[in-house]
């Protein structure tokens, strides 16, 4: 939550912290209270801002966020849908998520798609469309959404993470190594990074077999399809890309780009 607050404040406070207004400072304290789980105090601070400035974007957005965190999704929708800010993708993301959690997945998808029409390079919105496709077992569509999100917004780490996890359940786990390493280089020191490190280690363990003193068998790429719960989707890569992909993954985190086996 602190990260999203900094992003919001940057819209209003360009340059130095001294540019922040007392209202911004109260909103910042409200987010700190949310981080601490003190939702009542966060609500009080936000209400004090809105009493003086009912159209304050930050205060309204954070109020919607607070309601979402409290699992009051219908109320979050009512607050967020009143905010008029076409150029801020996180607003569409949060509103869409609130619709989805309130049980209106169709409206959630429309919200993400509307946000992308206004902000075509919003990788976070492709991420949410991919997540819905994944939840509905439309794995080919999920793959396309995550890849598009990584293409238009390469600095947003979550699409790389989702791609790595999707390929981890496929017969092309070589791409788990590539996307996973990219994710870990963008997002460092988080719980998600630790989990991805474990995923990569497991991918190596599951796909490298020592078959003798001088023989190693690698099975990172097999038949170009992803399988999950009996469903399959086509992957536009085959075994020919293994060497390039493996080198990219191995060099991304300082591991030597060539290996010599005795």
What is each PLM-predicted segment?
Residues 21-48, 52, 62-65, 69:
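Alpha-helical segment of the N-proximal tetratricopeptide repeat
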Residues 22-23, 57-58, 88-91, 123-124, ...:
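Helix-start (N-cap) detector for alpha-helical repeat units in TPR-like alpha-solenoids
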Residues 48-49, 82-83, 114-115, 148-149, ...:
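Canonical positions in the second alpha-helix
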Residues 62-65, 93-94, 128, 162, ...:
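Canonical tetratricopeptide repeat
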Residues 106, 173-177, 189, 201-226:
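Alpha-helical linker/edge segments of TPR/alpha-solenoid repeat scaffolds
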């Amino acid at each position: 939550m602190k990260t999203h607050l900094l992003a919001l404040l940057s819209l209003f406070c360009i340059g130095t912290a001294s540019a922040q207004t007392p209202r911004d400072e109260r909103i910042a304290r409200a987010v700190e209270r949310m981080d601490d789980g003190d939702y009542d105090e966060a609500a009080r601070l936000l209400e004090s801002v809105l009493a003086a400035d009912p159209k304050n974007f930050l205060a309204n957005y954070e109020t919607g966020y607070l309601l979402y965190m409290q699992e009051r999704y219908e109320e979050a929708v009512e607050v967020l849908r009143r905010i008029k800010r076409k150029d801020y993708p996180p607003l569409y993301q949060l509103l869409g998520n609130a619709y989805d959690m309130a049980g209106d997945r169709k409206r959630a998808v429309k919200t993400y798609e509307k946000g992308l029409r206004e902000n075509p390079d919003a990788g976070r919105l492709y991420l949410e469309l991919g997540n819905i496709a994944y939840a509905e077992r439309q794995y080919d569509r999920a793959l396309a959404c995550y890849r598009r999100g990584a293409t238009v917004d390469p600095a947003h780490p979550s699409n790389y993470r989702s791609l790595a996890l999707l390929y981890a359940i496929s017969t092309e786990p070589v791409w788990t190594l590539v996307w996973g390493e990219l994710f870990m280089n963008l997002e460092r020191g988080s719980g998600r990074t630790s989990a991805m490190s474990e995923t990569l280690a497991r991918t190596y363990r599951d796909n490298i077999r020592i078959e003798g003193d001088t023989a190693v068998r690698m099975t990172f790429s097999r038949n170009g399809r992803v399988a999950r719960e009996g469903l399959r989707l086509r992957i536009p890569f085959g075994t020919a890309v293994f060497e390039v992909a493996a080198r990219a993954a191995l060099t991304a985190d300082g591991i030597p780009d060539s290996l010599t086996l005795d």
